[in-house]
From Swiss-Prot:
One of its GO terms (molecular function) is cobalamin 5'-phosphate synthase activity. It is a multi-pass membrane protein. GO terms for cellular component: plasma membrane. It comes from the Bacteria. Pathway: Cofactor biosynthesis; adenosylcobalamin biosynthesis; adenosylcobalamin from cob(II)yrinate a,c-diamide: step 7/7. GO terms for biological process: cobalamin biosynthetic process. Keywords: Cell inner membrane, Cell membrane, Cobalamin biosynthesis, Magnesium, Membrane, Transferase, Transmembrane, Transmembrane helix. This is Adenosylcobinamide-GDP ribazoletransferase. It catalyses: alpha-ribazole + adenosylcob(III)inamide-GDP = adenosylcob(III)alamin + GMP + H(+); alpha-ribazole 5'-phosphate + adenosylcob(III)inamide-GDP = adenosylcob(III)alamin 5'-phosphate + GMP + H(+).
Amino acid sequence: MTTAVRGLLLALAFLTRLPVWWLGPPRREDHAASLPAYPVVGLILGILLLALYALLQWFFPDQFVVQAALLVAAWALVTGLLHLDGLGDSADAWLGGHGDRLRSLEIMKDPRSGPAAVAVITLALVVKVAALAALLRLDAALAALLIAPVLGRAAAALLIAGTPYARKQGLAGPLAEAPATRWIGLTALGALLFVTALAGWAGLAAVLGVVAVGVWAQHLMMRRLDGFTGDTAGALVEVAELAALLGLLAVLANSAG
């Protein structure tokens, strides 16, 4: 089994709850190879969501809100709620940390969810369902369900590769210690070409939205934590997916009008 394949399997095991056949413990080079595979995991997730969408069209024709709600639910469940959990933990840390680095890191380790987590997760899900429903109504399911997962995970890979790890040890520690390779940049370029080829100007708007929130999120992480954590990387996936959906919608809704 090649290192690239092992890296893809490791990325699938880490980012989803899909049953992944795995042989032996991951090696250091597997962690390095897993980062460029993040957008590929997003593509696999998108294909699964498209298959579900085809089924939902049969049972709930033209019920765009119902379709979007069930798609978002499946989206979250396939990822094991990992990224939503990171979003909630990050929200609690930013509200309860009061600007203190150590306090913020401590809050993120607390398994309990505070009011900020509940509010932010709820808002994120509502916006995601609304944006996806609008895109389904515009017959843009292919673009929405492929582009958002790909760009969300590309953003996380670039964050991890280009940002220090804020903890001495943690779930994302092996990734942070893995050497960044040229393949991450090539993967990001591949994601850009894929998105623009699939959706044109709307895809470019999605990319620009993700780049904007990625730069902003990294700035916040460096200022508060001096780096990223697994939770903040997961939060970025969720926010980047929202940015991608809204970027697509902004262009497609206006062009349809």
